[in-house]
Swiss-Prot record:
It is found in: Cytoplasm, Cytosol; Golgi apparatus. The keyword Repeat does not apply. One of its GO terms (biological process) is cell wall organization. Belongs to the RGP family. It comes from Arabidopsis thaliana (Mouse-ear cress). Glycans are attached at residue 158. Predominantly expressed in shoot and root apical meristems. Expressed in epidermal cells of leaves, inflorescence stems and seed coat. Expressed in pollen. It holds the Pfam family RGP. UDP-L-arabinose mutase involved in the biosynthesis of cell wall non-cellulosic polysaccharides. Catalyzes the interconvertion of UDP-L-arabinopyranose (UDP-Arap) and UDP-L-arabinofuranose (UDP-Araf) in vitro. Preferentially catalyzes the formation of UDP-Arap from UDP-Araf. At thermodynamic equilibrium in vitro the ratio of the pyranose form over the furanose form is 95:5. Is not active on other UDP-sugars (UDP-Gal, UDP-Xyl, UDP-Glc, GDP-Man and GDP-Fuc). Functions redundantly with RGP2 and is essential for proper cell walls and pollen development. It is an enzyme of class 5 (isomerase). Heteromers with RGP1, RGP4 and RGP5. This is UDP-arabinopyranose mutase 2.
C-alpha cells in the first residue's frame, strides 16, 4: 500500500528555483484544497487556474497563493471566435493557461495529484525535480544505459560518442505517478484494484524517432522552446473523443522536438495520484480513440517536417496540414481538429507576438 506524503509542518521553500520564470497551470471543476498539501513546494509560485464547466461556480483557492483564474466566459472574452479551439468540459482546457502565461516555464498538475514519498519516506518536491530535468541537457541521439548522464552520480558509459556528449536543450519533462496508474479504460476494467507502488529512481531521454503516451497530470515544459505545440486538441463537450488530449499533444511535440533537435525526458518526479476515474465513463470517451490510435500512431511515426519549418509554429502548421490530408479519411473529426490546430497557432501568436516574445 502506497500513501501520499504528510507535508504538515514542512516550511515553505525559502529559495524556490525559477520563482519568477515559471507558472503553474491547473485545470479544475472543484475547490483546490489539494494545494494545502503542496504549500511547502508551490506557494512561492504564480498559479494560472483554468476553471472548466459552469463559469458561475465559485472556486476556492487556499489563502496565501498568488493566482489568476479564468473561466469559460474569460476564454470567450479574450479569444473571441478563436475560443472555439479551447475544449470545454475536459481537462484539455488547461492549454489556455499555457497560452496566457508570460513565463518561460510551465508546470501543470491535476487537482487529484498529491505529494508523493520517495522510498526513504521523504516528501517529493516534484516541481524542483522537473526544473532540474529542464535545466539539464537531453541525449536523444544515442541511448545511455545509465539513463540520464547529467544526473549526480551518473555519467556517459564507455562507448558513448564524445561528439554527442554535449546533448541538446530539454523542452519537456514528463513525470510519473504512484498509486492510481494512468491506464486506459479496458485495462482499468480488467485490473480495477491495481496500484503502482514501484518508485523507479531514474530519468531518461526518450530517443529520437520514438513516440510516447504523454500524460498531462504531472508535466513541465520550456514554453519558449515548445509552447506553441502544447495544444491539447478538441476534446470533451461536442466532440466524439476524450482522454486523448495530452497524448495528442505528446505525439505532436515529439515529432517537432525530433525535427528541431530538442529533448524530451521522462521518469522522475513522481506524484501521488489519488483518485481513480470511472472506467465505464472513460470507455465511452476513449472508445473511438482506441481504434483510431492504431492509425494515428503510424501517421506520427511517418510524419516528416520540411527543412523550411524552423520554428515551432511553422512545424505545427505543417503538421496540421498533414492531419487534414492523411487523417480526415479516418473521421471528419480530424478535419475539424486540423482547423483548430491552425486557430490555436493564430490565437497563440495574437497573445504572444513574436517580436515581443522573441519566438519568431
Amino acid at each position: 500500500m502506497v500513501e501520499p506524503a504528510n507535508t504538515v509542518g514542512l516550511p515553505v521553500n525559502p529559495t524556490p528555483l525559477l520563482k519568477d520564470e515559471l507558472d503553474i497551470v491547473i485545470p479544475t471543476i472543484r475547490n483546490l484544497d489539494f494545494l494545502e498539501m503542496w504549500r511547502p513546494f508551490l506557494q512561492p509560485y504564480h498559479l494560472i487556474i483554468v476553471q472548466d464547466g459552469d463559469p458561475s461556480k465559485k472556486i476556492h483557492v487556499p489563502e496565501g497563493y498568488d493566482y489568476e483564474l479564468y473561466n469559460r466566459n474569460d476564454i470567450n472574452r479574450i479569444l473571441g471566435p478563436k475560443a472555439s479551439c479551447i475544449s470545454f468540459k475536459d481537462s484539455a482546457c488547461r492549454c489556455f493557461g499555457y497560452m496566457v502565461s508570460k513565463k518561460k516555464y510551465i508546470f501543470t498538475i491535476d487537482d487529484d495529484c498529491f505529494v508523493a514519498k520517495d522510498p526513504s519516506g521523504k516528501a517529493v518536491n516534484a516541481l524542483e525535480q522537473h526544473i532540474k530535468n529542464l535545466l539539464c541537457p537531453s541525449s536523444p541521439f544515442f541511448f545511455n544505459t545509465l539513463y540520464d548522464p547529467y544526473r549526480e552520480g551518473a555519467d556517459f558509459v564507455r562507448g558513448y560518442p564524445f561528439s554527442l556528449r554535449e546533448g541538446v536543450s530539454t523542452a519537456v519533462s514528463h513525470g510519473l505517478w504512484l498509486n492510481i496508474p494512468d491506464y486506459d479504460a479496458p485495462t482499468q476494467l480488467v485490473k480495477p484494484k491495481e496500484r503502482n507502488t514501484r518508485y523507479v529512481d531514474a530519468v531518461m531521454t526518450i530517443p529520437k524517432g520514438t513516440l510516447f503516451p504523454m500524460c498531462g497530470m504531472n508535466l513541465a515544459f520550456d514554453r519558449d522552446l515548445i509552447g506553441p505545440a502544447m495544444y491539447f486538441g478538441l476534446m470533451g463537450d461536442g466532440q466524439p473523443i476524450g482522454r486523448y488530449d495530452d497524448m495528442w499533444a505528446g505525439w505532436c511535440i515529439k515529432v517537432i522536438c525530433d525535427h528541431l533537435s530538442l529533448g524530451v525526458k521522462t521518469g522522475l518526479p513522481y506524484i501521488y495520484h489519488s483518485k481513480a476515474s470511472n472506467p465505464f465513463v472513460n470507455l465511452k470517451k476513449e472508445y473511438k480513440g482506441i481504434f483510431w490510435q492504431e492509425e494515428i500512431i503510424p501517421f506520427f511515426q511517418n510524419a516528416k517536417l520540411s527543412k523550411e519549418a524552423v520554428t515551432v509554429q511553422q512545424c505545427y502548421i505543417e503538421l496540421s496540414k498533414m492531419v487534414k490530408e492523411k487523417l480526415s479519411s479516418l473521421d471528419p473529426y480530424f478535419d475539424k481538429l486540423a482547423d483548430a490546430m491552425v486557430t490555436w497557432i493564430e490565437a497563440w501568436d495574437e497573445l504572444n507576438p513574436p517580436a515581443a516574445s522573441g519566438k519568431a
